[in-house]
C-alpha cells in the first residue's frame, strides 16, 4: 500500500457536516485495511481566490495509507459530493505523522491567547 496526503476544501455552509463526511471516508479506508496516519481539521479559512463565488472554505488534511482501489473509490466520492469544492491527493514516500505548520501555529495562537487571558484575570483581581 502507498502513502497519500489528501486535502479537502468543503463548502462553508456544510461545515457542520464535516465530521460525518470525514468519518465516512475514514471507515471506508479502514474497511479496505488502510490506515490513517494523520487527520487535521484546519477549520474555516480564507481562500486565495474565489471558487464559484465562495471566499471561504473548511479545510481538512488527511495522511493515509491505502491501496489504489480504495483511492479510486475516495476520488469518486470526492468528485460527486457537492459539498467538496476542491480536493488534492498527493502521493508520499512515507507516512507523515507530525503536526503540520498550520496546526502548530493554531495551537501556539491558542496558547498565547490563554496566557493573555490569564494575565488579564490576574491584573483584574489585583485591581479589585
Swiss-Prot record:
Alphabetized UniProt keyword annotations: Ribonucleoprotein, Ribosomal protein, RNA-binding, rRNA-binding
Stored InterPro entries: Ribosomal_bS6 (IPR000529), Ribosomal_bS6_CS (IPR020815), Ribosomal_bS6_sf (IPR035980), Ribosomal_S6_plastid/chlpt (IPR020814), Transl_elong_EF1B/ribsomal_bS6 (IPR014717)
CDD domains: bS6
UniProt KW RNA-binding keyword: yes
Claim: ATP-binding is one of the keywords in the record: no
Described function: Binds together with bS18 to 16S ribosomal RNA.
Protein name, per record: Small ribosomal subunit protein bS6
Gene name in the database record: rpsF
Amino acid at each position: 500500500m502507498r502513502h497519500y496526503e489528501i486535502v479537502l476544501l468543503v463548502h462553508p455552509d456544510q461545515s457542520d457536516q464535516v465530521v460525518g463526511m470525514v468519518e465516512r471516508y475514514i471507515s471506508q479506508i479502514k474497511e479496505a485495511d488502510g490506515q490513517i496516519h494523520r487527520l487535521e481539521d484546519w477549520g474555516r479559512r480564507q481562500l486565495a481566490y474565489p471558487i464559484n463565488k465562495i471566499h471561504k472554505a473548511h479545510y481538512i488534511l488527511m495522511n493515509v495509507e491505502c491501496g489504489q482501489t480504495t483511492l479510486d473509490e475516495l476520488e469518486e466520492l470526492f468528485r460527486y459530493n457537492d459539498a467538496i469544492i476542491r480536493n488534492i491527493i498527493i502521493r508520499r514516500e512515507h507516512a507523515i505523522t507530525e503536526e503540520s505548520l498550520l496546526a502548530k501555529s493554531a495551537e501556539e495562537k491558542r496558547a498565547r491567547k490563554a496566557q493573555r487571558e490569564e494575565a488579564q484575570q490576574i491584573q483584574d483581581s489585583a485591581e479589585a
